[in-house]
Amino acid sequence: MSDTGSTATKAKTAAIVSGYFSPLHVGHLDMIEGAAELADEVFVIVNNNAQQEIKKGKVIIDEADRLRVVLSLQAVDHAIVAIDEDRTVSASLAQLAETFTDYSLIFANGGDRIPDFVPEAATCEEHGIELVFGVGGNEKADSSSRINVELGLEDAQSAPPSATT
């Protein structure tokens, strides 16, 4: 049985954000700063190299470098590289919930995520993690894929349609 807890019974609240951060851009900063407004602390899951290969076809910026950049941000209290082997961060969310049992956790999603399809929803429900949407704004401020396509680091065919417009 999982401990779903409530904000009233936990000592602290942490908002969890996830992303590739390859490269980090203003939309990521908006999301992280928005998460900081929701909770006492901000935890970041940096998608791993295998996930980057699944999404983009190659590693553009190594996971250790992306983690280091994220950890340097003033608003970030804790960051990990994802342990997942697919494009979700379900296993990483479960790991954080099992590690930080004294926290009420929020999975903060940016403007490009919608409640209708969140692959991590079942994990959040199982571990009592609240889902929040529109963190940092309801519109996507920028796209790592757009930046990478313009720099010639990512093929336009592999990028999501919104990244090339």
Mark where each language-model region is.
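Nucleotidyltransferase catalytic core that binds NTPs
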Residues: M1-T165
